[in-house]
Amino acid sequence: MYDILPPELWIKIVDYSGEINLLLTSINFFELFNLVDVKVNVIEYIIENELIDVLKHIVVLKNLKHPIMGKNIISIESLNKCLLDSCNKGQLKIVQHLINIGANIESNNNYAVLLASGGGHLEVVKYLVSQGANIKSKNNRVVGWASQHGRLEVVKYLVSLGADIRSNDDYAVRWASEHGHLEVAKYLVSLGADIRSKYYYILCGASQNGYLEIIKYIVSLGADIRAYNNCAVKWASQCGHIDIVKYLASQGADIRNDNDYCVGLASKNGHIEVVKYLVSQGADIKTYNDHAVKVASKK
């Protein structure tokens, strides 16, 4: 097809249409990138359309130090952006080719390995590590991110490389618990993670988000359910998690703490079943000058 018309005409056709599809159909057409005036981001277009063979060809050209690679048709900014997107999606082959072309795995504080870890893409994580990615950057944020997203196998791998699960005030177990990832939380605790970190924020976060099994597990370890001024039952009441409110109350949480603040929060947010339960347990809806009644009447 390339030989049907002289290169000059192909260049005019591409410049007029603004489309680069044609240039990606053969080696001869690809050479015309030196001569055309297109506004399309080449590497992003290639990645979005998963044109693996084109990526392979670019790797070959780079290794050969072909003149076309010096024409800025592919910027380092585009490479790095596409690398992050591919790591997030777990596209190992694309990640490998992008790095071979020149994408920087350490850009944005090793954000590539963080995204791959959060996405649970273990093979991508392993490859990035083999290429020098730093799993301990930003105070071991990578293992915390994997924990937050419930990626147990990734967490185990990172730990095997020396990731510090206790950094950042036990960030890993706090976020695993707050997001309901029980198996990750158990694993981290087995390695020494402290459930009491940050005034039992684990318990409060799990209560706020409605993760009863996490709460039961933490309580089984001896957590103080009244910690941080009974924040757990307050947040559960505020968010309408009736089963958690009942469980915490059964374990000794003070539902009347702060002048019946729980019933006020439940009323404010329209959680009638929680309000009924709290009242049945002795909560006074008239506390704070009928605050609960006034707030509920405004909804």
UniProtKB/Swiss-Prot annotation:
Q: Kindly give the Gene3D superfamilies that the UniProt entry links to this protein.
A: Ankyrin repeat-containing domain
Indicate yes or no for the key word Disulfide bond: no
Record bears the keyword Repeat: yes
- Which parts of the chain are ANK repeats? 78-107, 108-137, 139-167, 168-197, 199-227, 228-257, 258-287
> Could you tell me which InterPro entries the record lists for this protein?
Ankyrin_rpt, Ankyrin_rpt-contain_sf
Q: Which UniProt keywords apply?
A: ANK repeat, Repeat
Record's superkingdom? Viruses
Q: Please identify the protein, giving its name as recorded.
A: Putative ankyrin repeat protein R864
Q: Which organism is it from?
A: Acanthamoeba polyphaga mimivirus (APMV)
User: What lineage is this protein's organism placed in?
Assistant: Viruses, Varidnaviria, Bamfordvirae, Nucleocytoviricota, Megaviricetes
